[in-house]
């Protein structure tokens, strides 16, 4: 779902600077959340935040793109703009950074010499959930577009994970529910529990609920038994079959409910080596944790 900001709300937000955020460990401090919540006194802010929440947790929902492009044009993409994006995120859940060596917002640029399948690579970034091998993955992953690929590539892709699972055979689903999968490393992480290895792709929740712990990268980079690999490959095919894709524009803020949707990115356009490093695609990533007792991400 794409959500436009009403023009009067945009004008009011431009005139309402927010204070710098403070962190409690790696989480946005409650004092900052309370200060940012003063934006609810602006007409249409709460209504817009409610639309955002419904798009993420309402029936049939699971992702939203908040169109903040006019705010980015007016304010630039520096601290003032990022504070506004953080304020909207805090209406959904608690912003945090699981990476101790990174700031709250993690910069995802383009590195032409990086593994093409990585988030900062230039190739196809297949469907996955972030921090798939943590016992408590972020409930939401969010991406703020600072600059799209100037050559026109790299549309975002999303797919309803539970809808894809529902199209599989009962045999494949039973294999995906076995603790037989593993992927990646786990170090210097905070707020996401412990390493989960091995893990099931389906966690035994009722149909349509819980995480679908999947990353297509494990099909190539993890040693899996043949039957389990085949079941995971079938899931990957169904995710592609049900995908939606769109190009993020400057200021677009994509928020994904990880309990419902998996995400990825098509390859960037060829010729990235001709684009100066300072002119390549840039996204900023922020993670969110559902509040204690909040079933909104279930």
State each model region's role.
Residues 1-51, 59-62, 105-298:
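Active-site environment of non-heme Fe oxygenases that use a 2-His-1-carboxylate facial triad
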Residues 37-107, 115:
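Long, mid-chain structured domain cores
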């Amino acid at each position: 779902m794409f959500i436009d900001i009403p023009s009067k709300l945009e004008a009011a937000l431009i005139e309402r600077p927010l204070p710098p955020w403070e962190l409690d460990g790696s989480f946005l401090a409650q004092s900052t959340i309370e200060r940012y919540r003063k934006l609810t006194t602006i007409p249409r802010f709460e209504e817009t935040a409610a639309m955002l929440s419904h798009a993420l947790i309402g029936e049939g929902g699971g992702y939203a793109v908040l169109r903040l492009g006019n705010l980015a044009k007016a304010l630039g993409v520096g601290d003032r703009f990022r504070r506004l994006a953080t304020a909207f995120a805090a209406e959904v859940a608690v912003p945090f950074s699981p990476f101790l060596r990174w700031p709250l917002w993690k910069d995802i640029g383009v590195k032409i010499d990086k593994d093409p399948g990585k988030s900062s690579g230039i190739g196809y970034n297949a469907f996955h959930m972030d921090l798939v091998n943590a016992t408590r993955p972020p409930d939401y992953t969010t991406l703020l577009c600072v600059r799209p690929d100037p050559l026109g590539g790299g549309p975002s892709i999303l797919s309803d994970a539970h809808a894809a699972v529902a199209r599989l055979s009962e045999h494949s689903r039973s294999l995906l529910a076995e603790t037989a999968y593993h992927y990646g490393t786990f170090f210097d992480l905070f707020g996401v529990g412990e390493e989960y290895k091995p893990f099931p792709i389906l966690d035994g929740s009722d149909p349509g609920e819980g995480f679908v712990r999947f990353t297509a990268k494990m099909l190539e980079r993890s040693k899996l038994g043949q039957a389990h690999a085949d079941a995971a490959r079938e899931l990957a095919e169904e995710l592609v079959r049900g995908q939606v894709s769109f190009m993020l524009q400057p200021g677009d803020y994509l928020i994904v409910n990880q309990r419902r949707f998996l995400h990825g990115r098509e390859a960037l356009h060829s010729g990235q080596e001709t684009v100066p490093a300072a002119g390549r695609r840039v996204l900023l990533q922020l993670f969110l944790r559902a509040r204690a007792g909040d079933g909104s991400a279930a």
